[in-house]
Amino acid sequence: MDVNISKLTKDLGKIVGKEHVRTDKPTSVVYAKDTMPWDLEEKNIPYAVVRPSNSQEISKLLKYANEKLIPVHIHGSGTSLVGLARPKTEGIVLDTARMKKIRVYPERGYFEAEPGLHIVQVKKELAKYNAMLPLFPGSELVATIGGTVAVNTSAHGVDAALGKPGDFVLGFEVVLPTGEVIQTGTESTRRAAGIDPTKFFVGSEGLLGVLTLIRMRLVPLPYFENIVAYYKTTEDIIDTVMEMYKQGIHPPLFYEFLDERAAKIGFEAVGLEEPIGAVAMMRVHSWSKLGSEDKAQNFLKFLHVGNPIEAKIVEDIDEWNTIWTSRAEAGNYMYRLGMTFGSEISPRVDKLKEAFHDAQLIVKNLKNYNNAEFISFGHIGAPTIHAYAFIPTKDISNDLKKALTLEMREKSEDLNIKYGGCGGEWGLTAQRVSFLKKKYGESLYELLVRMKKAFDPNDILNRGNLQGWI
């Protein structure tokens, strides 16, 4: 695409203000990078990065992009683990970082937030009104509410306990790819029945429009109780989760696990005594103190079905925070000392143990690398297993990085198909398009392509993500 950068810079400056347009190479490279381990290609590097402040500026930007046929890539925080954030073609990156207003309406039962707010910022504001944000990404310090809702990710939250983000969305302000600004949903706390365009945009991964205002129901801040359980093996934790669903026991809000290796790494990193085996961490909630305490005691009794070495309610918040931090530190250790090639496996509950064993075999038998170490953790109660191939070096070729990413992606997605899963956390386009086709068929994929074309006839927004890439 032949673009006059000088003219582009001036044109964009008229829309968002020249101080909010960057076309220098260092900035463009930063916005092209994401969590993927391989090098950038020239096509990933945008012509310009713009930071609009409102829906009207975004509307003008998208109308301009349609006129010039220049792709626009939406950027929240760039934390996608399936390549959603890396531009697939040269174009304009639309950074939502300036859009950080939030308004809380307790008398109406909802709040409205702009997409550039980090999750932790929204939580802090809602806490002033004794309300909870029902979004739980591990990257809450940097993840934005716009990106989280656009992917509809549950992250740490167990879907069966509270639901997904979209279950709390009442409506949006959206700028369509062609520049029109629309309103969806309701200002009542009762969501629309029937055809509700709001649902088109929840989980749409930025393909159908730019979310510029998100209206969500206020959720009263519950009381929490935290539980930790130590087991000889990861299989004991898996058996407990399977039995929980079989008995119809209401799941905890959080139900995390560290396998034997991850538990050792994580606990050592935070200064805790090394556990004998695997570790499970749970958080239960209720809207009364007595209710949460009773729920925790009952769940603690249930946990003995899996014969834990020890299971206890952690009443000291500092102790709990240290235990909880061990999960993140297990991942940080791997990132510091080598490279990880990961997966998101969300099988049918009764196939959870089989999926775990198959994931171990995938890492053990990688064709592109011998002797990779298997390490796993994740949201086992959801259920989601993050199975990783850990390689204790960063000194591998760019081609090998791609090959390992692709091999882990394809083989773990085959497990999702084999065991009835989909992907409850990372989204379903970009690197997952081949899985989407295999799971749901070409007919459904073509329906999505036609839907995208109806909303975005010039394929302006997030071009390439629906086509798939590696």
What residues fall within each predicted segment?
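N-terminal flexible segment immediately upstream of the FAD-binding catalytic core
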Residues: M1-K63, S80-G109, A262-V270, I317-F341, ...
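FAD-binding subdomain of flavoenzyme oxidoreductases
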Residues: K100-Y105, G109-E256, I460-L461
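Activity-critical C-terminal alpha-helical subdomain
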Residues: E180, T429-I470
